[in-house]
């Protein structure tokens, strides 16, 4: 592949995946600045790769490299704290208070997610924040596709149960 085409390919990958990788790495290392370093290193490694070798599974390759680098950083620093300030997209809504309601629900879901086992949190984030398929998640986490599906199902079921319980509790107060 000629250099101009490779550069275009890398820029396209950066545009498409940088935000998702940054949120994923920040969740693992617990710090946005360290996550930026991890994502930067991920893309530096992409620059050294032959596009033909990974173009059919670029997302899996990027997330796997990012995950491994982030885990190395976390292991070195031997600590992990939850991401306190998650990025959210602004919501436009005609109904007054809907945006605040959405933010409260999102905050509640994120708080409840922190109570889930680590493997369930990871597959949830890869699925819903990064919009990856079960197969891609399977390759990144080295779990079977069936196990990914089970973890997602269990996590969603648990979150739904907890959200309903909290909602009912608020209603009766």
Give a label for each model feature.
Residues 10-12, 108-116:
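Short amphipathic alpha-helical boundary/capping segments
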Residues 18, 22, 43, 117, ...:
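C-terminal flanking helix
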Residues 64-84, 102:
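Arg/Lys-rich amphipathic alpha helix in sigma70-family domain 2
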Residues 1-23, 27, 33-36, 47, ...:
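A short, charge-rich alpha-helical start-of-domain segment used by transcription regulators
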Residues 71, 141-166:
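DNA-recognition helix of helix-turn-helix
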Residues 80-106, 111, 133:
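Internal acidic/polar
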Residues 123-127:
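A short pre-motif secondary-structure segment
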Residues 23, 37-44, 48, 56-68:
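Structural recognition of an alpha-helix C-terminal capping motif at a helix-to-coil junction
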């Amino acid at each position: 592949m000629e250099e101009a085409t490779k550069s275009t390919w890398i820029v396209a990958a950066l545009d498409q995946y940088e935000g998702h990788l940054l949120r994923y790495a920040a969740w693992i290392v617990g710090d946005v600045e360290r996550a930026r370093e991890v994502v930067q290193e991920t893309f530096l490694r992409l620059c050294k790769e032959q596009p033909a070798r990974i173009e059919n599974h670029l997302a899996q390759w990027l997330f796997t490299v990012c995950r491994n680098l982030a885990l190395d950083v976390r292991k070195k620093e031997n600590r992990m704290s939850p991401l306190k300030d998650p990025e959210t997209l602004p919501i436009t809504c005609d109904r007054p208070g809907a945006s605040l309601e959405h933010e409260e629900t999102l905050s509640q879901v994120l708080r409840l997610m922190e109570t889930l086992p680590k493997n369930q949190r990871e597959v949830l984030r890869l699925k819903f924040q990064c919009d990856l398929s079960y197969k891609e998640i399977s390759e990144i986490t080295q779990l079977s596709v069936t196990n990914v599906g089970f973890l997602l199902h269990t996590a969603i079921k648990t979150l739904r149960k907890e959200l309903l319980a909290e909602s009912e509790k608020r209603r009766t107060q």
